[in-house]
C-alpha cells in the first residue's frame, strides 16, 4: 500500500510502537509513510516518545531515513532500546542532513549531448528542460524550437544512458495544443493531488494532469493572470516576459519570472488558493540586463535555506549561471557563487567527459527526486540537466541546434 501517489517506491517493511510499549513489525505490507518518498527504504521506524522499547532484526538504511525524513534522535534513543545498527544508521543520516551545505564555489563534470532534436521532425533544438525522477523513471519536459516557433515535448527513460533513444511525445498533440508554449516546469501539487506543468505562452500558463506518465492527459492552458501584469509591461521594454517558475512553502506559492532586462519578478498567492489569486509582481532581484537575464530556478535545500539560480550572459557571449541563497522565498538574496569568475556553472568550472561540446551552460533544472511543490533538493551531489550548443552553430536564434546535457557536481561538501 502507498498512502500517496507520489510515494512511488514504497517501503517494504515498517515498525510502529503502540501504547503498550511493544513493537509491531510487519513485513508483508509495503507502506510509505512519507508522501514524497521516492527513494526505496527497507524499513521504517515510527517512535512515540512515551514508548520504552523497540527491537528489530534489520537496520534502517541511511537512504531510507533520508528519504522519509525520519531519524532516531539521541534524546529518544537514550530512553528506548533500539538496535545498535539502527542507531548507527540514524545517526549517520541525521549528521549528513545537519552538516550538508552548499559550497561557496562549484565544480562539475558534464556528459556529452544526451537529448537532441529528432531527425526529420522539423525541430531544430531541444531546450529549457524540467526533470523529475518518479516511479522508477526520469520524466523530462522541454521546449521544442524551430523557425516557426516553440512548443513542448515529453520524454521519459529509466537511465540517462538511454535518454538519446527515448521516444518523444510532442505536447501539441495533447489538450495543451498548438501555438506558442515554452520553458516548462513540472511538479506535483500535493494539496490537489495533481501534477502541474507551468510554462509561458505569452502569459504565465499552466496545465494539470492526474498522471505524469500519460502525456495526453494534460489540460488545456489556463493562465495565472488575465493579461500581462502592469509591472512586467513597464519593466521589460521591448524584451519578453519569460521563464515562469513556481515554488511553495507551507503558506504561499510563489511565481518567479524574468523580463530579459535585468529584473527577476516574484508574485504569490496562498497555498489554499493556488493557482488563483496571484498578486501583482514585485522585483525580487535586479542587476544589469545580461548579468540577470532569464531561466531562474528556486529550490529548498534544507535548514530553512533556499537556493536561487539565474542565467546570465558572460563577457564572452556565452551563457552561464549565477547563484544566491536566502532564508525565505520572499527574502533578500545573498550572493553564493554569483560572479563570472566564481559562477554556479560555466564552461570554466565544468570538465567534460569527452569533447567540450558547448561553451554555454544554459536554461535547465536540478534533477529532483522529491517531486512536490516545495521543490526540495539535497545540497549534496547535485545533478543539473541543461541546454548546450555547438560553439560553431550559426543562424537564427530559433533554429540553433540546442541539445540537453547533464552536469554532475564533483566538489560536494557532504
Task: Give residue spans per PLM region.
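Fungal extracellular serine/threonine-rich, low-complexity, intrinsically disordered "mucin-like" regions
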Residues: 1-99
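Carbohydrate-active catalytic/glycan-binding domains of CAZyme proteins
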Residues: 96-414
Amino acid at each position: 500500500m502507498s498512502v500517496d501517489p507520489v510515494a512511488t517506491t514504497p517501503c517494504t517493511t515498517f515498525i510502529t510502537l503502540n501504547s503498550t510499549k511493544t513493537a509491531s513489525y510487519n513485513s508483508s505490507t509495503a507502506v510509505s509513510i512519507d508522501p514524497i518518498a521516492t527513494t526505496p527504504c527497507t524499513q521504517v521506524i515510527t517512535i512515540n516518545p512515551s514508548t520504552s522499547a523497540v527491537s528489530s532484526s534489520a537496520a534502517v538504511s541511511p537512504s531510507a531515513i533520508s528519504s522519509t525524513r525520519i531519524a532516531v534522535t539521541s534524546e529518544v534513543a537514550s530512553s528506548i532500546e533500539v538496535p545498535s545498527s539502527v542507531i548507527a544508521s540514524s545517526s549517520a543520516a541525521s549528521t549528513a542532513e545537519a552538516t550538508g551545505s552548499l559550497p561557496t564555489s562549484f565544480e562539475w563534470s558534464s556528459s556529452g549531448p544526451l537529448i537532441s532534436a529528432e531527425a526529420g521532425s522539423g525541430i531544430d533544438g531541444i531546450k529549457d528542460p524540467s526533470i523529475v525522477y518518479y516511479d522508477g523513471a526520469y520524466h523530462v519536459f522541454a521546449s521544442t524550437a524551430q523557425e516557426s516557433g516553440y512548443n513542448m515535448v515529453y520524454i521519459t527513460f529509466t537511465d540517462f544512458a538511454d535518454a538519446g533513444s527515448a521516444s518523444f511525445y510532442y505536447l501539441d498533440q495533447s489538450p495543451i495544443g498548438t501555438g506558442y508554449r515554452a520553458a516548462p516546469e513540472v511538479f506535483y501539487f500535493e494539496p490537489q493531488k495533481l501534477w502541474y506543468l507551468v510554462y509561458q505562452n505569452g502569459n504565465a500558463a499552466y496545465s494539470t494532469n492526474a498522471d505524469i506518465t500519460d502525456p495526453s492527459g494534460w489540460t488545456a492552458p489556463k493562465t495565472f493572470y488575465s493579461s500581462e501584469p502592469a509591472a512586467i509591461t513597464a519593466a521589460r521594454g521591448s524584451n519578453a516576459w519569460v521563464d515562469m517558475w513556481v515554488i511553495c512553502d507551507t503558506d504561499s506559492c510563489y511565481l518567479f519570472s524574468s523580463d530579459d532586462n535585468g529584473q527577476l519578478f516574484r508574485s504569490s498567492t496562498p497555498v489554499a488558493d493556488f493557482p488563483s489569486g496571484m498578486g501583482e509582481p514585485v522585483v525580487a532581484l535586479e542587476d544589469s540586463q545580461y548579468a540577470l537575464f532569464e531561466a531562474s530556478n528556486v529550490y529548498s535545500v534544507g535548514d530553512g535555506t533556499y537556493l536561487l539560480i539565474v542565467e546570465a550572459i558572460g563577457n564572452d557571449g556565452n551563457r552561464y549561471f549565477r547563484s544566491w541563497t536566502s532564508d525565505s522565498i520572499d527574502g533578500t538574496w545573498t550572493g553564493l557563487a554569483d560572479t563570472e569568475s566564481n559562477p554556479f556553472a560555466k564552461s570554466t568550472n565544468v570538465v567534460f567527459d569527452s569533447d567540450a561540446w558547448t561553451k554555454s551552460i544554459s536554461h535547465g533544472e536540478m534533477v529532483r527526486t522529491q517531486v512536490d511543490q516545495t521543490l526540495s533538493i539535497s545540497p549534496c551531489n547535485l545533478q543539473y540537466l541543461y541546454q548546450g550548443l555547438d560553439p560553431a552553430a550559426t543562424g537564427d536564434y530559433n533554429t540553433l541546434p540546442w541539445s540537453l546535457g547533464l552536469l554532475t557536481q564533483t566538489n560536494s561538501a557532504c
